Amino acid sequence: MAKIDVHHHFYPPAMRQALDRAGGDPSGWYIPPWTLELDQDITRQMKVTTTILSVTAPGPGIEPDVTKAAALARSCNESAAAIRDAKPQQYGFFASVPSLFDTAAVLKEIEYACTTLRADGVTLFTRYGKGSNYLGHAAFRPIWADLSRRGAVVFIHPTHPVDTQLINTWLPQPMFDYPHETGRAAMDLLTSGILQDYPGCKIILSHAGGTLPYLIHRAATMLPLMPRTLGLSTEELVEAARTFYFDTAISSNPVTLKALFEFAAPGHVLFGSDFPNAPHDAILRFTNFLEAYELPEETKRQVDSGAALELFPRLKGILDKAKL
């Protein structure tokens, strides 16, 4: 049976070189080794049949010059497309884009990646620029309009908050802070009108939605009761939050999975690993826990591949032909 990993990173040479020039990841996380051989080894261990590659944060925006950032996004996308073309049953990819404040460059890269390279979707990070500019920012509306028109799958991955100071030296930001950033970005989308105005996108939130499933009822209950309201009821806000898709990357534990499956709409949970950025043994521990977690067989099938095949028609055709 097919198993599709929708949260799976790679480091093309141009991206690794850009990170080295910048002195590493601003979040404090290490830059892990990545080769195609290492990638295929972990997928065998996880029994994954198809991997959707993506460039993780900070992405092309590590280049402060907008022209260089656009060129880096193009190079990453062409590297991903080459891997996919060599093994179309085993790989797909989410396209990288430069900073969303560079609207023209982003729209140009989305057009090229989706039309020429046939990307399976687009990666966006939780915020852009020097401030707390989350994905509901008014400047990003032309990009959301374009993605909605295309019916694009949008993979939202956390990046470092404005304040890069660590809790302490034991805790680089991806370990604990990133789920908060995902929750913040999701709430910004819910309360800025983006989801209502551009409903064509299918949005995947990383790491089981971060803090969103845990905190949505807190915010949704109070928002309609404030002096300044959105005009949405508690129930409408919660239902809007349930339209997101959620991957399981480094999130498979009894507390998180219970909350996620109670909250997410049916068919909206997808398997993810976070290779190579999570430690190898942690990836296998989370993967094995998910496999052993008691779920109805149809739900297991949806998590492994069914939900992803609904999102990625290219893969559905290929895997149906292969009878996976």
From Swiss-Prot:
Keywords, comma-separated and alphabetical: Cytoplasm, Decarboxylase, Hydrolase, Lyase, Metal-binding, Zinc
UniProt main location, coarse: cytoplasm
Induction record: Expression is correlated with the production of patulin. Expression is positively regulated by the secondary metabolism regulator laeA. Expression is strongly decreased with increased sucrose concentrations. This decrease is lost in the presence of malic acid. Expression is increased with pH changes from 2.5 to 3.5 in the presence of a limiting concentration of sucrose, 50 mM. Natural phenols present in apple fruits such as chlorogenic acid or the flavonoid epicatechin modulate patulin biosynthesis.
Record EC number: 4.1.1.52
SUPFAM superfamilies: Metallo-dependent hydrolases (SSF51556)
Consequence of gene loss (knockout): Completely abolishes the production of patulin.
Practical uses of the protein: Patulin was originally used as an antibiotic and specifically trialed to be used against the common cold, but it is no longer used for that purpose since it has been shown to induce immunological, neurological and gastrointestinal effects. Genotoxic effects of patulin with dose-dependent increase in DNA strand breaks in brain, liver and kidneys have been detected in mice. However, more recently, it has been proposed that patulin might also have anti-tumor properties.
Binding site for Zn(2+): 7, 9, 157, 274
GO molecular function: 6-methylsalicylate decarboxylase activity; hydrolase activity; metal ion binding; polyketide synthase activity
Pfam family, one: Amidohydro_2
Domain of life: Eukaryota
GO cellular component: cytosol
Catalytic activity: 6-methylsalicylate + H(+) = 3-methylphenol + CO2
EC primary class: lyase
Stored InterPro entries: ACMSD, Amidohydro-rel, Metal_Hydrolase
Gene3D superfamilies: Metal-dependent hydrolases (3.20.20.140)
Function: 6-methylsalicylic acid decarboxylase; part of the gene cluster that mediates the biosynthesis of patulin, an acetate-derived tetraketide mycotoxin produced by several fungal species that shows antimicrobial properties against several bacteria. PatG catalyzes the decarboxylation of 6-methylsalicylic acid to yield m-cresol. The pathway begins with the synthesis of 6-methylsalicylic acid by the polyketide synthase (PKS) patK via condensation of acetate and malonate units.
Subunit structure: Monomer.
PANTHER family with a match to the protein in the record: 2-AMINO-3-CARBOXYLMUCONATE-6-SEMIALDEHYDE DECARBOXYLASE, AMIDOHYDROLASE-RELATED DOMAIN-CONTAINING PROTEIN
Name of this chain's protein: 6-methylsalicylic acid decarboxylase
Annotated organism of origin: Penicillium expansum
Highest classification ranks of the organism: Eukaryota, Fungi, Dikarya, Ascomycota, Pezizomycotina
